[in-house]
């Protein structure tokens, strides 16, 4: 399955929020030596992960840009210029119910979004990791080639 249409579908779900909040979106479509990047995945769950990550980026970004790009051939990045995640919270962000100091100030935070993303990514064979700096934003990395499929 081509990744570009899946990513565009997920981005479109938030287009009005980007416009209403005057946030910039930078999207660089994926490509490989054949022109388009493809992967075997479950469309519904892959889009769920992308949409959850975009929702988080929008929730914690007051101004600036959310960027979606490939930092390496098979590593998708969703980067924001938001408030960032405190260093002491980073090791626990994928724990069920953990909201960290940002989540405690946001009444809508459940501590389930990143937990579900991690579980779904594991089932899809996708690695997920996060880097963040307070006041500088967050970058989520999805390693799409972490578990190569073997022909049987």
Q: Locations of the language-model features?
A:
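Acidic ATP/Mg2+-coordinating residue in the GHKL
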Residues: 80
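Glycine-rich ATP-lid/hinge loop adjacent to the conserved G-boxes
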Residues: 98-108
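Short helix-loop "hinge" at the ATP-lid/N-box region of the Bergerat-fold HATPase_c
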Residues: 57-58
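Short beta-strand/loop element within the Bergerat-fold HATPase_c
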Residues: 63-75
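Short conserved segment of the HATPase_c
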Residues: 85-98
